[in-house]
């Protein structure tokens, strides 16, 4: 998993902007984010804020809950453990996409049957056998192993007292409202982030049970929105932002030719959470605020002290935002089960892909100097031809 980082020169990342890491949900694909983070560390990218949903919340908690020198090791420990239940020594010898596809589906079926070490185990008797309303009747799997794993790999005292900001999203089951558990906000309220907040962000029904926090019950945030970019942009307007957004599902893809391909494509669209649309909308909001500021600057002096002008000044305040957008691109042999195929070979491949994509981004220095002209928000997408500047 670290074979790509030995002989690559590190690029220089601008220091003036607050560095943010945004991690989408995506189950077994999450090792792509771990590989991306390892490569970012090699390039001295030290996030001051990590926001995640579902598996992104778990990765985010491991990053925020450890000192810098231990983060990659803890991420490796988690992903080695999660993939230890599906290790087949002969798997790397498979070269045929068709055979590899069969292997992936078999691995996913085994995971669905036996669970993932340190993450979840199947309930026995199964959920339908238990009385309605009992905790065991609400999900097919028991996630108590994940709590023990988080307690072991994450220093929650560090999260609740250290400088790295952590934000994880979940949905309130009763209200249907999206909520973020944010250690910065919690500190002001005298509250603390714990394993339950991370588990709530990843409690995808009906596989995983809801998580109770202060009398309210929560499910996976990906049900409402699988990418926490909007939250970051909404809650930081005073400082420039340099955001690495690491997504696990691509909104773009080919028209399916089979039922299996249709199932995968549907999942990609659903969990990509309209990322490009959200980015475009935020860009339009930034540009509108910029236009308001320009208009205010042209007002006669007699209008400067008008309360309405003061209000417009306040609401139009914006920082400069650069988003570097990395998206995991599915392989031909992957299907709709890719997010619960915790096989060792899949984990290693996803990790390596995350590393490669970060190095590819760093090979295009145009974004490093933030060449934004007079624009307040720009996005760079990594595509097959390199890092592409997206004009919204």
Could you describe each region identified by the protein language model?
Residues 51, 169, 242-246, 322-326:
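Hydrophobic/aromatic beta-strand patches that form the interior of the parallel beta-sheet core
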